[in-house]
Regions:
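Phosphate-binding and adjacent anionic-ligand microenvironments
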Residues: 1-101, 105-106, 110-118, 122, ...
Length: 143
């Protein structure tokens, strides 16, 4: 079963007004050594990077392509993280983070989204270094 954070407690953490010069997303994407790298959450659960890309949006109507929409980090267990910058405020952009994770243990599939996604979110914060760049340990909005 795939647990997605689309409309649940930890759906979409939002970190507004980020200085874009501090965002190291592209460096992460452009570093091939990140493929195969294992990150361990504070809970002890490990995630090994299987693929990283900078995704694009293809309009379903006119088929126009908008490149560099954000990064996707895929893990060997089927979990993934999507991070993208959106908009610009007077002091920077907003980082939107989407996380989904795969859980094969049936007993765990009935736990709360917050509990199930916490390890993957922990790893997303390690990779993005958002607490370092923003001075915040949690997002201002969770949808």
């Amino acid at each position: 079963m795939r647990v997605k954070i689309i409309c649940s407690l930890l759906c979409r953490p939002v970190f507004p007004e980020i200085s874009t010069r501090n965002i190291l997303f592209q460096i992460f994407v452009d570093t091939p050594s990140n493929i195969g790298k294992t990150y361990t959450a504070t809970s002890g659960k490990s995630f090994t990077v299987s693929k990283i890309d900078n995704f694009e949006y293809i309009d379903p109507i006119d088929k126009s392509v908008t490149k560099n929409q954000g990064i996707r980090i895929f893990f060997e267990d089927g979990s993934r993280i999507v991070m993208r910058l959106s908009g610009t405020g007077s002091s920077g952009a907003t980082v939107r983070m989407y996380v989904d994770t795969y859980e094969s243990e049936r007993a765990n599939q009935f736990k709360s989204a917050a509990e199930m996604l916490a390890p993957c979110i922990d790893v997303a914060l390690q990779i993005s270094q958002l607490p370092k760049f923003t001075g915040r340990n949690e997002p201002t909005v969770i949808t």
